[in-house]
């Protein structure tokens, strides 16, 4: 059994989630404490600049200009996150077997076999004095896979604790939304479904100065533009069968016409819910249960809109099952780090489109 810490900095650019689990790489035997280290406004601004610059990258190891500055900021933020986490919870470094370090995705173009996560694992391992596993996605993309989503193996481990007969979907609504379809047998299908919070968060920042729509309050006051949503759902991505994946900026060109902020928030919230529901006809069977994690799970308006789209199947928050809403992806990368140490698969043909089940990750020691 291993004690693993996972860290995740997602496409929402909000901060670093930290989580400890006990696992053998197959089962999760215990959930440990979780933590969160928000990015400062300066760090978040630097990451947004890096995202804009990264569209010009052609090599995954290139770190020109602001991207190199952002990599240093990401590394230091993760070092601070794990050091504070250990101190706050009275955990000794020597009791940690592995730290799973995802880094910050700034570019994801699997069609070009290119995925770029910034973060210096060597510097991090030296700073925290614990072995670090990183570069989880590279082997999958190099082999022709989508390189995402990577959390399905962890979703399946969690689902082992559920008494279920029919298929379920576990949804993570982060900057990008993704689903994992798990049936009563061994079928595991996963894919990105479309924008999660990214378009909405960007809209909120641009129109209100707020980083996100807390509790869906603004969207609740507005009216969704059904015509705009129907047009947006004509994007060819939505007709593709799984597996498929997205870059955070793939839908950035979708422009809302001028409208009151409340209507814009309502439209983008409804679009996220509708995009998730569009996966149902592409699955072997309609899911009988939906379990939602990620920042979107804290938006009751988004959940209500999703319920309307997938009825009569129930939609519930992950924390109703004792799972973590905010730290699930961090837990997943601790779990994946343990799997990587044992050479177990991290991705599968039906989750990323990789030709064969693939292990991955690179270990850096202090």
Curated annotation (Swiss-Prot):
Domain of life: Bacteria
Gene3D superfamilies: 3.30.420.40
Any single GO BP term: 1,6-anhydro-N-acetyl-beta-muramic acid catabolic process
Keywords: ATP-binding, Carbohydrate metabolism, Kinase, Nucleotide-binding, Transferase
UniProt pathway: Amino-sugar metabolism; 1,6-anhydro-N-acetylmuramate degradation; Cell wall biogenesis; peptidoglycan recycling
Catalytic activity: 1,6-anhydro-N-acetyl-beta-muramate + ATP + H2O = N-acetyl-D-muramate 6-phosphate + ADP + H(+)
Enzyme Commission number(s): 2.7.1.170
A single GO molecular function term of this UniProt record: kinase activity
Binding site for ATP: 10-17
Keyword field contains Kinase: yes
Family of this protein: Belongs to the anhydro-N-acetylmuramic acid kinase family.
Function of the protein: Catalyzes the specific phosphorylation of 1,6-anhydro-N-acetylmuramic acid (anhMurNAc) with the simultaneous cleavage of the 1,6-anhydro ring, generating MurNAc-6-P. Is required for the utilization of anhMurNAc either imported from the medium or derived from its own cell wall murein, and thus plays a role in cell wall recycling.
UniProt protein name: Anhydro-N-acetylmuramic acid kinase
Source species of the chain: Nitrobacter winogradskyi (strain ATCC 25391 / DSM 10237 / CIP 104748 / NCIMB 11846 / Nb-255)
Lineage start: Bacteria, Pseudomonadati, Pseudomonadota, Alphaproteobacteria, Hyphomicrobiales
Gene name in the database record: anmK
């Amino acid at each position: 059994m291993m004690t693993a810490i996972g860290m995740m900095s997602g496409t929402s650019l909000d901060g670093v989630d930290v989580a400890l689990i006990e696992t053998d790489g197959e089962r999760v035997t215990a959930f440990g404490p979780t933590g969160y280290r928000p990015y400062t406004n300066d760090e978040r601004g630097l990451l947004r600049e890096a995202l804009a610059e990264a569209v010009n990258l052609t090599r995954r190891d290139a770190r020109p200009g602001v991207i190199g500055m952002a990599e240093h900021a990401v590394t230091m933020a993760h070092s601070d996150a794990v050091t504070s986490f250990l101190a706050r919870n009275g955990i000794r470094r020597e009791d940690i077997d592995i730290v799973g370090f995802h880094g910050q995705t700034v570019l994801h173009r699997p069609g070009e076999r290119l995925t770029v996560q910034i973060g210096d694992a060597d510097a991090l391992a030296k700073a925290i004095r614990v072995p670090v596993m990183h570069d989880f996605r590279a082997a999958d993309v190099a082999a022709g896979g989508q390189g995402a989503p990577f959390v399905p193996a962890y979703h399946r481990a969690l689902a082992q604790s559920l008494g279920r007969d029919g298929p379920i979907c576990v949804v993570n609504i982060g900057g990008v939304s993704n689903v994992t379809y798990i049936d009563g047998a061994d079928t595991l299908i996963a894919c990105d479904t479309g924008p999660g919070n990214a378009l909405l968060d960007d809209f909120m920042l641009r129109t209100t100065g707020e980083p996100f729509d807390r509790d869906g309050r603004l969207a609740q006051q507005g009216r969704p533009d059904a015509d705009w949503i129907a047009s947006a759902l004509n994007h060819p991505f939505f007709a593709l069968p799984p597996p498929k994946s997205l870059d955070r900026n793939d839908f950035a060109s979708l422009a809302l016409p001028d409208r009151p902020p409340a209507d814009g928030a309502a439209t983008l919230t409804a679009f996220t819910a509708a995009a998730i529901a569009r996966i149902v006809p592409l699955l072997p069977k309609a899911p009988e249960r939906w379990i939602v994690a990620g920042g979107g799970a804290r938006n009751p308006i988004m959940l209500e809109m999703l319920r309307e789209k997938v009825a009569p199947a129930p939609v519930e928050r992950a924390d109703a099952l004792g799972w973590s809403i905010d730290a699930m992806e961090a837990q997943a990368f601790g779990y994946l780090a343990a799997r990587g140490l044992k050479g177990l698969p991290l991705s599968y043909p039906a989750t990323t489109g990789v030709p064969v089940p693939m292990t991955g990750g690179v270990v850096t020691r202090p």
